[in-house]
From Swiss-Prot:
Residues 377-395 have a biased composition (Low complexity). Residues 37-49, 308-317 have a biased composition (Basic and acidic residues). It is found in: Cytoplasm. May negatively regulate the SNF1 kinase. This is Protein SIP5. Residues 1-49, 305-334, 377-404 are annotated as: Disordered. Keywords: Cytoplasm.
Amino acid sequence: MGNVPAKEGRSRSSTFSGTGAEIVTRSARRNTTSSADVKKSSRKSEEKDRLREKHWRDLVVRLHENVDGGYLAPYGTYKSNLDFDTEVVRRLVINRQLAPFYTPLNDFDPTWTTEELLVILSQLPLHSIEDAYSDAESEEDDVDNHKIHKSNNYYRRQEQKRKLKHSMETAKQAQKEEETALLHQKMLLKQGGQVSSSLPSKDLLLRLYSDASECPICFLYYPSNLNISRCCLQPICTECFVQIKRLDPHPPHDDASNQPNGDSLPHTLISEPAHCPYCAMADFGVIYDPLSDLRTGINGKCSPGEYRMPEHSDAKSDVQSVKKRPRRKSMAATDPGIITVDNIRPDWEQKLISAKNKLARKAAAASAIHASNLILNGDDSQTSSQQSRLRSRNSGGQTYNTIEERMIEEALRLSLLDEEERRRKERENSSKD
C-alpha cells in the first residue's frame, strides 16, 4: 500500500482542497454581489436625478400650458416647500378638480376702469423669477465645512447640493426664455401683428379679473373662482394650498420620548394629517367648482386668445353671479371631488416608513456599541480568586450570549422591515406600469 496515502493524510488533503475551493467560490460570489449592488445603486441614483430634473421642469410656467386663464405651475409667491407631486397637481388642474395657478394682483380696486385694469394686467409676468429664486443661489453652511477631516456623508451632501443647484439654474433659465417669448407676443399685439392663440384675450382677462377676490392667506388678489375648504368653506388659492402638508414623522405629543434628549422608539413615530388653516380641522382638503361657461386652453372649448364674452353680457355681473351660487355644506375628506393634502403628496406613507427604518437602524447601532462596551468591560475585570474568575467568565458568557441574541433579533427585524418596503415599492411600480 506504499503509494496510497495514510487515512489522516487523505482527510487533511481533501479538507484543504475543499476549503480552498469554498474560499474561491465565496470570493467570486462576493465580487458578483458587490458588482450587482453597485449597478443597482447607480440605476437608483440615475432615476432619482431624472425625477428631480422633471420636478423642476414642471415648475416652469409656460404660456401654452393654459387652463381657463391660469397655468399648471405656481407663480412663485413662495420660495420653499415646492415638494408636492407636480404630476398629480398638473393632472388635477387639467381635469378642473383644482383651480389653476392664476397670476395674482398685488392690489385691486373695484373703482378701476376697464382700461386701467387692462393696463395693469398687460404688465403681469408669467412668474415671479426674482422672488422665487432669490434664495436659490445662497447655500447653507454645512456643519462639516470647518472640519479638517470630512466624512463621506459630507461629500455626498455636497454632490446633492450641486445637482439641486444645477436643476434650479436650468429651471430658472427655462423660465426666463418663457418670459422673453411672452414679451415678444405682447410687442406683436401692440404692433397689430399675428400673435399666438395662447396669449389670453382682453375678454378673458376682464372675465377673470373684473371682480377679483383676496386670498385670506397670502393677501393677493385672484379671479373669484378659487378653491373652497371642505370644512369651513373658506377660499384659498392653489399657490397656498400646495404649501400645506403633513408634519414630519415624530413621536406622539404625549410621549415622554418626545422631550429633548429623549430616545424615540421606531414604532411610535406618527405622521399627523394637515389641519385647516382656518378652523384647524384635520385632513384638510378643498373642492373646486370650475366656471361652466369658461373652458379655455387645455381640454377647453377654445384657446385663450379666441375667447370672446357673449354679447349683451358684462364681466362684473357674470362674476357676481358666480359669487351668488348656492352655498355648499361642509364635506368629509373622503367625499368625491375633495382634494386633500395627501392627494398631492402621496409619498407621505413612504416617508413615515423610511423614518421608522432610519430610527431602527440608529437604535441597532447604539445597541451594538453598548454591547461591545459591556464585553470589553467584562474582559478587563479581574478577580482575586479562581472561583470568582470562573463565575465572572460564566456570567460574561451569558451576557455575551444574551447580547448576541438581541443583536440577531434586531437584525432580523430590520431585514423584515427592508423586505416589506421593497415589496411595497414593487407593488407601486407595477401599479404605475
